[in-house]
């Protein structure tokens, strides 16, 4: 694999992040790292067996070619790609920040990307370890997987939901699952030691809050017609509805649901149904035909940005441009407030005619300083500095077609 650099991209950001992490963890990390003589078995703060802690984000890209089954993990720190077990005929790839879930008709393959982040609120820890194949979940190509630190919820196309112990996945194995009672529309979403779901009952669908045993503990008095799409943010969980979205939050053990309406009639084909955002950000994007919806969760506002036909969209959040990969093969930057285009790259996609091919379309992955765009036919991934006029910072030449791509380590 060849890495082409246009400048040295990460040095300054890494130095700043190192300083921040050193400061934020100094108070408790230094004392915890030196156990007292009377406590020889004390575990240092942030210690994870078998993992290496780092001062900066340990980003990796999971890449898969459904045709050949070739799967790679691209380490964005070293620029090296590593092979892993092949997974053929995958139709979707989703990640929870550490694990990749490759959905096929015969099951869902779980891949531990070996890079993750632990957020302690006032500071974070970044880890890396050897990547490994975990195994198969008995869930088909249309199953939806959602995780938090404790459980992984798998909702199949028939509405049945299974819970898996995520701690077992971290040990490299899939433990037996627990089946939740009832059926559900859309994904069951773990949140604040509970589960959020739209329960099917008597021909209607209603939002419920379940405990981890599947027992209902709350039923917020809100309506959400045709629920579709979800995202976990720092301010709560967003659930897509026909007329906008619900924001579900937990406060002092109580759950509230607030409607964020579009404020206008929106045709079904222009609804926000698949949300994309930078993990940790409160600004969401969703393609909407020839435009992109931007949902500012903090301000509870929707903004529609007219762009032209959209292949993929994303943003790093407040103060950053809206990034849109369009059918001309170029990445475009837009000012969210004004809707005006501010930057544009050269065409990045080798085969523009296939750019909008459903779940196998190229994507935009975004972290705190860079964005990544996959060019399947060109066997390349581009690293974009979105704070510098969409400058191409690096390009990675691969030995596989990166049809499916997801970033871990965030």
Walk through the language-model features, giving the residues of each.
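Intrinsically disordered, low-complexity segments enriched in Gly and acidic/Ser/Thr residues
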Residues: 291-376
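Short beta-strand elements that form the blades of beta-propeller/WD-repeat-like
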Residues: 53-66, 92-111, 142-163, 186-202, ...
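Repeated scaffold domains used in trafficking and secretory/extracellular systems
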Residues: 42-54, 86-99, 128-150, 178-193, ...
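Bacterial signal peptide processing site
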Residues: 25-29
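Acidic, serine/threonine- and glycine-rich low-complexity intrinsically disordered segments
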Residues: 193, 199-321
């Amino acid at each position: 694999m060849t890495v082409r650099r246009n400048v040295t991209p990460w040095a300054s950001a890494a130095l700043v992040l190192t300083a921040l992490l050193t400061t934020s963890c100094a108070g408790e990390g230094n004392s915890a790292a030196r156990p007292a003589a009377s406590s020889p078995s004390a575990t240092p703060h942030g210690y994870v067996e078998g993992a290496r802690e780092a001062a900066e984000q340990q980003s990796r890209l999971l890449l898969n070619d459904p045709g050949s089954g070739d799967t790679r993990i691209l380490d964005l720190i070293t620029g090296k790609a590593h092979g892993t077990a092949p997974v053929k005929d995958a139709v979707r790839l989703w990640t929870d920040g550490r694990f990749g879930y490759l959905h096929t008709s015969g099951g869902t393959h779980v891949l531990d990307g070996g890079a993750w982040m632990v957020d302690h609120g006032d500071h974070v820890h970044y880890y890396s370890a050897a990547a490994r194949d975990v195994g198969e979940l008995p869930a088909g190509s249309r199953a939806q997987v959602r995780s938090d630190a404790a459980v992984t919820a798998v909702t199949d196309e028939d509405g049945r939901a299974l819970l898996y112990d995520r701690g077992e996945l971290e040990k490299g194995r899939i433990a037996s699952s627990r089946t939740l009672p009832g059926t559900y529309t859309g994904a069951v979403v773990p949140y604040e030691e509970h589960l959020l779901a739209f329960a099917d009952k008597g021909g209607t669908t209603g939002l419920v809050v379940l405990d981890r045993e599947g027992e209902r503990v709350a039923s917020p008095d809100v309506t959400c017609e045709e629920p579709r799409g979800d995202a976990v943010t720092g301010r709560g969980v967003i659930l897509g509805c026909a007329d906008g979205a619900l924001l579900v939050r937990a406060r002092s053990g109580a759950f509230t649901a607030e409607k964020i309406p579009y404020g206008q009639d929106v045709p079904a084909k222009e609804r926000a149904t698949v949300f994309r955002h930078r993990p940790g950000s409160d600004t969401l994007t969703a393609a909407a035909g020839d435009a992109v919806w931007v949902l500012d969760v903090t301000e509870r506002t929707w903004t529609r940005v007219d762009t032209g036909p959209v292949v993929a969209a994303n943003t790093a959040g407040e103060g950053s441009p809206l990034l849109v990969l369009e059918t001309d093969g170029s990445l475009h930057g837009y000012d969210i407030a004004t809707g005006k285009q501010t930057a544009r790259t050269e065409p990045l996609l080798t085969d523009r005619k296939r750019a909008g091919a459903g779940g196998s379309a190229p994507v935009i992955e975004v972290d705190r300083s860079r964005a990544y765009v996959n060019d399947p036919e060109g066997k390349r991934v581009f690293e974009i500095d979105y704070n510098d006029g969409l400058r191409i910072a690096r390009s990675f030449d691969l030995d596989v077609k990166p049809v499916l791509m997801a970033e871990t380590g965030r």
